[in-house]
């Protein structure tokens, strides 16, 4: 899907700052430095719109990106970063929970997991939490270019087994920002959830 004019509209920390209107929203969640910003930039074909950082825990707000007045991408603060204080983690946690559990415009969540490693306890908690709230989930296994293509099936199997994957509510796609594979399939899922036309 071609996006011509993506814009960061607001970096929100509470419900009163969320954008008005009824555009569908797709949220991106995952551990710090799992590649959320790289995925967003790849999907919209804009380097640098979503800020990529070598410093984990950099995103500390809900960043709402308006894509041509068609939908919003919402970049959610990364979890699992030890150097963020406990108080900050609790603050982020309540902010994220408020958004993910109560936002009517939210049509699906893309949960990013590093393809090179087994899902962490934080990954499992996030998946179970999204399942509890009955949010449609797309698991994107990032950095798949670092995995031999012959091991893709094994990676998928490990992720599904570890998460106790529910195939009726969830989908799984392997993705590489470097080699650009998986982006078309991710867009197809987004368009289906947000009921978008080309």
UniProtKB/Swiss-Prot annotation:
GO CC terms: cytosol
UniProt family annotation: Belongs to the TRAFAC class TrmE-Era-EngA-EngB-Septin-like GTPase superfamily. EngB GTPase family.
The protein's name in its UniProt record: Probable GTP-binding protein EngB
HAMAP family: GTPase_EngB
Gene symbol of the encoding locus: engB
GO biological process: division septum assembly
Keywords, ordered alphabetically: Cell cycle, Cell division, GTP-binding, Magnesium, Metal-binding, Nucleotide-binding, Septation
PROSITE patterns: G_ENGB
GO molecular function: GTP binding; metal ion binding
Organism for this UniProt entry: Oenococcus oeni (strain ATCC BAA-331 / PSU-1)
Residue ranges of domain EngB-type G in the record: 22-196
InterPro entries reported in the protein's UniProt record: G_ENGB_dom, GTP-bd, GTP-bd_ribosome_bio_YsxC, P-loop_NTPase, Small_GTP-bd
Residues annotated for Mg(2+) binding in this entry: 37, 59
Function: Necessary for normal cell division and for the maintenance of normal septation.
Cofactor (UniProt): Mg(2+)
Gene3D superfamilies hit by this protein: P-loop containing nucleotide triphosphate hydrolases
Binding site for GTP: 30-37, 57-61, 75-78, 142-145, 175-177
